[in-house]
Amino acid sequence: MDNLIKDMRENLNSYSFKVVSDLVKELDVNRDNKAQIKELADLLKEDKRKNVSSLGNRLEKNLNNLIKEEERVKNMYLFDKSFGDYKYVAGVDEVGRGPLAGPIVSAAVILDSSDLDDIILYINDSKKLSEHKREELSEIIKEKALSYSISMCDSKEIDEKGIGYCNNHVFIKACEGLSIKPDLVLSDGYLIKNFNGENKHVIKGDTKSACIACASIIAKVYRDNIMKEYHKKYPQYDFEKNVGYGTKTHVDALKEVGPTEIHRMSFLKNIL
């Protein structure tokens, strides 16, 4: 990067717009090269050619977006630290409460909040992220988390015990499955009933808390992958796309073919 800046300082006027544009497109704006990106953006903005100058403005915008993202995520980590002097704070969230088929899945995650220069960028409510971004982040989270755990209840358990019970049960099991005992558990939406530990609930926690957002992401990816496997066995229900939710294609297939072993019969009373 330093060599590129040196080269640009010496030869920018001799480079065509296309050459400069191609070089800029190849740049990865990240936390490790912010100073160099700022220097290069300023250099391009000073160029008398409007199109080259606009590349500098674009690069500066990308840098500013990165800085804003760092600040947003840093605040999520600080939110987790704001509850007191707890060493290990876990976030727990679930996915799959509302679908007609498949399990309800919960994940619990403990992050390292001691180094705010090593945060996981782009974490958010899993529903706000693209499938590709969720999958990418899920691997990063599992690699960087101090501990994580996943728990689920299948459709049979949901029919036998109810979705409310199963929702609470997977929260407890995910927390109990952590290799590190959390000093505090932040749960998305509501308190965990009959949980043997310190617990606080956070409304819309997956947009406020770093550890809840991470739990949301790995739970979503885990469940989506289960439903993709079920799609291979039951392709007519389109589980690959609807992941068990009641889309028109899914409901039409239910009416035409009937339910499968993974359908929640207690959810189908108004459909069949």
Swiss-Prot record:
One of its GO terms (cellular component) is ribonuclease H2 complex. Residues 87-272 form the RNase H type-2 domain. Manganese or magnesium. Binds 1 divalent metal ion per monomer in the absence of substrate. May bind a second metal ion after substrate binding. Its cofactor is Mn(2+); Mg(2+). A divalent metal cation binds at D93, E94, D188. It catalyses: Endonucleolytic cleavage to 5'-phosphomonoester. The keyword Manganese applies. It is an enzyme of class 3 (hydrolase). GO terms for molecular function: manganese ion binding; RNA binding; RNA-DNA hybrid ribonuclease activity. Gene3D superfamilies: Ribonuclease H-like superfamily/Ribonuclease H. PANTHER family: RIBONUCLEASE H2 SUBUNIT A, RIBONUCLEASE HII. This is Ribonuclease HII.
